[in-house]
Structure formats: C-alpha cells, structure tokens
Amino acid sequence: PNVRLSDEIIARRGAELAVVAEEAYQQLLKDNPDALHPVYIVGSEVPIPGGSQDAVETGLQVTKVSDFKQTVATFEKAFHDHQLDEAWKHVIGVVVQPGVEEKDAGCTPYDRSKAADLMASIKEYNNLVFEGHSTDYQTKISLRELVEDGVGILKVGPGLTYMMRE
C-alpha cells in the first residue's frame, strides 16, 4: 500500500537501529578507545527514491512547524523507551522538507520566504540542525540560503549518483 507509516513506527524503527549502532560502538571501543561516538539524524520526511514525480507541478509543502516539533518529541520518546537517553544527546539533525525537490524533469528551487516559519523553529533546539534532502540540483545561491537558514546538512543523491554512474 502507498500509505505513509506513522511517526511512532518510524521513530521506533529509528530507535531500534540506534540500539544496534550503540552496541556496535561499544564493541569498537574495545579495540579503539579513541573512536568517535556515532551521531544520529532522525526524521520521517524522506522523499521517495529518485525524487517526487509530481512535486514540481503541484507544489511542495514545507514541513509544518508543529509536525517538525512532533517528530522531535516522538523520536526522543522512542529513544527514551529503548533506554537510549545518552544516545539522544548525539542526535544532531532532523530531516525536514524545506520546499526543495528533484525530479526527472527539473527541480523545485528553495524559496526561503515559504520556509521562514520552519527555519525559525530550529533555533529552539540548540543541538539540532535540519537535514534537507534532494539539495544537489539547487543553485549556489539557494544552497547558501539553505545553510544560512538552518539546513546544516545538505543531502545529495540523484545528481551525484548519476555522475558517478556515467
């Protein structure tokens, strides 16, 4: 079915993966006591592989501030429920939709005015930045604006993957 999973299911699965990562890190420390602790990016707003097929025509919806905050709270609870309170301190980013998308026939450029409320909301979280997916077709100016506005992790994929494949 083409139905999005609930935030609770996504967060639970994320926490389950973090349990495995934390266990692997503890094993790594036995051989490498100076190993860096893993960091985590959480979220539920991940686009389909290859980008949206209709987003350019219909217009993208920027993540609502309330949805972003609910995502953070849901993941924090899932980490807590899996005894990962210490690991939660290593969550550094949250995946959001800042209004950019890539697709076969083009891309939706970043419009900071449409994302202003979302971008302002990250300032409430001192330890977090946004991760923006599908940013590799944005202009240099748009990339700079994304970073200035709070997208500290630019997720590339389709363009880079295509170039490597070719």
Predicted feature locations:
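Hydrophobic faces of well-ordered beta-strands that scaffold small-molecule active sites
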Residues: 1, 38-44, 92-96, 128-133, ...
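Glycine-rich phosphate-binding active-site loops on the catalytic face of alpha/beta enzymes
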Residues: 1, 139, 149-165
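Internal, well-ordered domain-core segments that constitute the primary functional module
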Residues: 1-50
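Active-site loop/helix belt of alpha/beta enzymes
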Residues: 14, 41-81, 85-88, 92-100, ...
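Flexible, glycine/charged-enriched surface loops at secondary-structure junctions
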Residues: 24-37, 81-91, 133
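Short, glycine-/Ser/Thr-/acidic-enriched flexible segments
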Residues: 47, 99-101, 137, 159-161
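Conserved, mostly hydrophobic/aromatic
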Residues: 146
